[in-house]
Amino acid sequence: MAVLKNAKRFKKKFPLTIAWRLKSNSDVVEKHLNPDEEVKYVFVGQKNNRFYDIFSTCVIAITNKRILIGRKRVIFGYMLDSVMPYMYNDLNIKSGFIWGKVTIDTIKEELVFSNIDKAALSEIETNISESMIALKRKYPKSEKDEK
């Protein structure tokens, strides 16, 4: 229930963010939390690159081990993305007139979250950056990186 509580808190704090079905999307993330994982920060948005597509709401949870992105399908099934610290490359924030976008660049793909209240962007950037920096420090560098 920590994910849903934090998602609702985020939505209340930043009401211009477009997000639907917070409970069902939060349940996807809750289902995949490991017993030793704790939720540090949660935000919501649309997992797409288009401001006019408002039907792909997801809940993004930053834990003490990874970033989880949960989306519940309308009829059946769900989708979950997980970003481990070693997969994380970069973070890009774009602010528009009303909404903003957050792009998490990973080794495999770019994850874009849109229709987020632009007032929330600095808070999201701070939480993702600080979490990923702290988590990356825990992973030892490979021999290839040391050369």
Q: What is each stretch, according to the model?
A:
Residues 45, 61-63, 100, 131:
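Small-side-chain structural scaffolding
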Residues 1-22, 26-34, 52-53, 73-147:
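Acidic, Ser/Thr- and proline-rich intrinsically disordered linker/docking segments
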